[in-house]
Amino acid sequence: MRLFLRDFFMSMYTTAQLLAANEQKFKFDPLFLRLFFRESYPFTTEKVYLSQIPGLVNMALYVSPIVSGEVIRSRGGSTSEFTPGYVKPKHEVNPQMTLRRLPDEDPQNLADPAYRRRRIIMQNMRDEELAIAQVEEMQAVSAVLKGKYTMTGEAFDPVEVDMGRSAANNITQSGGTEWSKRDKSTYDPTDDIEAYALNASGVVNIIVFDPKGWALFRSFKAVREKLDTRRGSHSELETAVKDLGKAVSYKGMYGDVAIVVYSGQYVENGVKKNFLPDNTMVLGNTHARGLRTYGCIQDADALREGINASPRYPKNWKTSGDPAREFTMIQSAPLMLLADPDEFVSVQLA
């Protein structure tokens, strides 16, 4: 990576170099995208056509407008083609901005104007990539939790994208079923989990908790006795959930089911928030078919360079004037979908 960065700093920026840097240096791969959304389908059109995705000939979305924060389903409709919201985070290349120090970076290099400019561009791209990846992960999490989410974007009125999750797959503990009201020394929540899992359209092999949900689950003596924290007996699952960063913790196997705790966060209006609400439990399968689809890049420069169907289009350009200014931007039109939203069961613990 050090040689790559050195060569990158010594050369001028081309789209190919920006794409390579974005892929190698700024890859952002949160839990839900990595585990459940492994297929990618960039389209050459602004619209995503579900019938063109292998195995989704009959899939449709129910799209409803959102007015003053309220979903108006009476004005919505079912469709097999949809134009995703367009996102394009943009930054100015400002020589005065504060830079994050890279590991092993010589601080003397930052005094070199050319080096500093290139480092600023790289830092801008990292922030832009994280902004887009945050949108993708939020869509993915909401698709798994609710089977639907709100789509927003540049010059795009908010709409609700509904994949048709069965109501029985969104469960809220109530009426005496709350785990918080159970005797932690005698109650065994295994039967509850097995009952919830029956609502899934396939086999459940993973449960994802938020930290508070995990604390509630682990408070039962029966859980602590049954949880197998040894490694090696389920290598495929362990491989799928390892090396996911500090926001993910693999807790062990509960029977044939992997237990994972996710504390990933996003930033909204400068405030950090958790992707998973408090006391959330998600039952799913690591082979569920999540789809990363993308509308085409709507940029004349991209078309001229032959870049149309792509998840990302990074660019770096200058504007003439007094003074001239320089900018960076990454463009994308993401739409995260589940081929079968009923492969997941979402439980709000209480």
Where are these regions (language model features)?
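N-terminal alpha-helical "arm" segments
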Residues: 1-49, 341-350
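Sequence/fold signature of self-assembling virion shell proteins
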Residues: 224-350
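Hydrophobic alpha-helical segments and helix pairs
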Residues: 9-29, 156-186
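Long, contiguous amphipathic alpha-helices that act as assembly "spine/axial" helices in icosahedral shell
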Residues: 87-166, 188-192, 196-213, 324-330
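Acidic/histidine-enriched, beta-strand-rich ligand/metal-binding domains
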Residues: 179-207, 211-220, 224-228, 234-245
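Pocket-edge structural micro-motifs
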Residues: 30, 51-54, 60-65, 284-285, ...
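Short, Φ-rich (hydrophobic/aromatic) sequence segments
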Residues: 22-23, 191-196, 336
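Assembly/oligomerization interface modules of large self-assembling protein complexes
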Residues: 39-107
